[in-house]
Regions:
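N-terminal helical cap/lid subdomain that shapes the substrate entry/recognition surface
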Residues: 5-118, 130
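Asp-based, Mg2+/Mn2+-dependent phosphohydrolase catalytic module
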Residues: 1-13, 23, 46, 94-100, ...
Length: 252
């Protein structure tokens, strides 16, 4: 891969969902600790934070790149039951009760469990006013479109591509290419923004899109093309992409 600088008008911006548009409030580990306490277990939020991080790392290591981790919409519950079992197994080897599973599932599918970052609405309004196409590309459950609708974000997006519905996910190129086709744009005319170096930054670039990493907490200083806030992409609307902001287009 040889980086080249090409000024191409950005006609569309794709956004990741979690840690880009939305964040859980209260934090995930606090919710798990509270629900597990209903089964008689006593874990701190720190305990859960470590167990969740270790479980996600193991799941990602086992996944085939781009494979839908849920096995389609019908496999979502099975995936999360197995995930919860692994989390609890790391903590004390205990069993997650059906009631605990249902409480967690209901919580995270509710609008009230999620908040929209303060920089989201201003940038969406700005880009929409500039006639820039907008889409969501996310590795998420099938309820994401309803969640976006509940927060009033759906009207901004021409399409929402969700891995559980698409049957493919990031970093695989297919989900990016499908979204490009739905908006009628070529990959080089798209900027993708998300928080995952692998799924968002590398995945989008591998599909021929431009990409920036949204690094809200300054965790990835090794990635040159990163931003700390969505407001930093406002300058791309309606004109050629700034190479210093958006980075190089991948080529072989």
């Amino acid at each position: 891969m040889i980086p080249v600088r090409v000024r191409v008008r950005v006609r569309a911006v794709f956004f990741d969902a979690g840690a880009t548009l939305l964040y859980p409030d209260p934090p995930v580990e606090e919710v798990y600790a509270r629900v597990f306490s209903g089964d008689g277990a006593r874990f701190t939020a720190g305990d859960l934070r470590d167990a969740l991080a270790a479980t996600w790392a193991a799941v990602q290591a086992e996944e085939k790149d781009g494979g839908d981790r849920y096995g389609g919409v019908r496999g979502e519950a099975e995936f999360w039951r197995a995930f919860l079992t692994r989390v609890r197994g790391l903590l004390d080897g205990g069993v997650v009760s059906p009631a605990a599973f249902e409480r967690l599932a209901a919580h995270f599918r509710s609008r009230e469990a999620w908040r929209v970052y303060p920089d989201v609405l201003p940038i969406l309004e700005h880009l929409k006013a500039a006639d820039v196409g907008l889409a969501v590309v996310s590795n998420w459950d099938s309820f994401l479109p309803r969640l976006l609708e509940g927060h009033g974000l759906s009207p901004f997006f021409q399409t929402v591509s969700v891995s559980a519905i698409e049957g493919t996910g990031k970093p695989e190129a297919e989900i990016f290419r499908r979204t490009c086709a739905r908006l009628g744009v070529s990959p080089e005319e798209v900027l993708h923004v998300g928080d995952s170096p692998r799924d968002d930054y590398e995945g989008a670039r591998g599909a021929g899109l431009r990409a920036v990493l949204l690094d809200r907490d300054d965790r990835h200083p090794h990635v040159a093309e990163r931003i700390r806030s969505l407001s930093e992409i406002a300058g791309i609307a309606g004109r050629a992409a700034r190479p210093d902001l958006i980075g190089s287009a991948p080529t072989s």
